[in-house]
Amino acid sequence: MKNELPYEKTGNAIKGYVESVIAKSESRDCVVRAFASSFDVSYDFAHKYVADEFGRKPRKGTYGTVAKLVNMSDNLIKVNGKKICPLGVRHNDYMLRSLMYDVTVKGVTKKRNMTVGTFVKQNPKGTFFVLVKGHAFTIKDGIVIGNPEDATKTKRPMRCAFEIK
């Protein structure tokens, strides 16, 4: 497809994903997979870390991800020697809808939410933990790691993003 981004299969991108017994029985684990691929840790380590630090219940999804990542950034917490840097404008203690940019249409400047496609164009290099409505995935050097449809839905508005350095 024309607007499709490069995609890497989860099994190739995450250490120990194919062999993991936990991964085979999990669902709604997008935050765990994004965490594992962003920080270059194994799936099982990421699963335990997200359960302990983010309060994730098995097969139930992860809630409050943005607040937890902002807290990790504020407290300078590193995982696997890597730190988190929030991108965009910070609104008090949350980062939702922080990635806005100006667009001039017919002489009028308006703010627009950044889409996944625009974000990749503006950030071709680096590792990013990306959150869209109800979902999380990783973008590494312009390559999407997550679900296959994450690479095809380039017009999807982003909620927020964190650079992993």
How should these model regions be labeled?
Residues 143-165:
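Noncatalytic regulatory segments and standalone regulatory/sensor domains
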Residues 54-134, 140-142, 147-149:
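Conserved active-site-adjacent core of cysteine acyl-enzyme catalytic domains
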